[in-house]
Amino acid sequence: MTISSQEFALFEAWENNREDFVYDGVVSEADYLESKTKLCFVLKEVNDIGGGGWDLRNFIKEGARSQTWDNIARWVACLRDIESNINWSELETIDNEYRKKQLRSICAFNLKKSPGGHTTERASFDAVVAEDREYIQKQYDIYNADITVCCGTGWDLREILDLNHSEVFETSRGIQWFLNKQNKPVFIYSHPAARVHTPLLVYGLIDAIREVCQ
């Protein structure tokens, strides 16, 4: 089965149990599978107080928006050329076309499929994720990602994957990570829109992945 057909079958069952369902996952299956390194970004929930019923994959395919997705595009650009040191001057200015180009090859999904507001209400998030645990496990397994980046969701995904007792490693600069059940690295990192000086947020992740994966 293709990735898209597996997503469709999973979401068909899942959306019956979750109001205002927002679809997500692999943006372009061909680009994802052709990638030397399959990248998966795990987020909490979409910010849409108006309600769901739309597809994050299409939103990303059209370039998404600068908040959140500029930094993910920067991460992807650096990871696709990890042996090089891309200067900040090459990353500082991001436009819609750049995001479209960089984001086509990724997988991006939210643990909570119903939308929330600007900030996550932890109690609501925890309750929904607990109810949808098996669905989330199945979705993650579809992608067989080489590198997973948890964008403020690392400890949540670790629990969902029943890896609470697995070892958590730390890079020389203090970035934590663990291995999933396929022995692929999962990085516990900040949300891409975190209030951190942007170059530090961008290069902090790249340095960690370079240390672990090269």
Over which residues does each language-model region extend?
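C-terminal capping/extension of enzyme domains
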Residues: 2-12, 122-137, 156-214
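Active-site and ligand/interface coordination hotspots across diverse enzymes
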Residues: 1-80, 135, 139, 175-182, ...
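Surface-exposed cleft-lining segments at the edges of enzyme active sites
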Residues: 54-63, 78, 112-129
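Short mixed-charge
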Residues: 79-102, 166-181
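Short, contiguous, well-structured surface segments enriched in hydrophobic/aromatic residues
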Residues: 99-112
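Ligand-binding pocket scaffold of soluble enzyme catalytic domains
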Residues: 22, 31-34, 85-95, 100, ...
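Proline-aspartate-enriched helix->loop->beta-strand connector
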Residues: 136-153
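Short, solvent-exposed loop/turn segments at secondary-structure junctions
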Residues: 45-49, 112-116, 153-157, 191-195
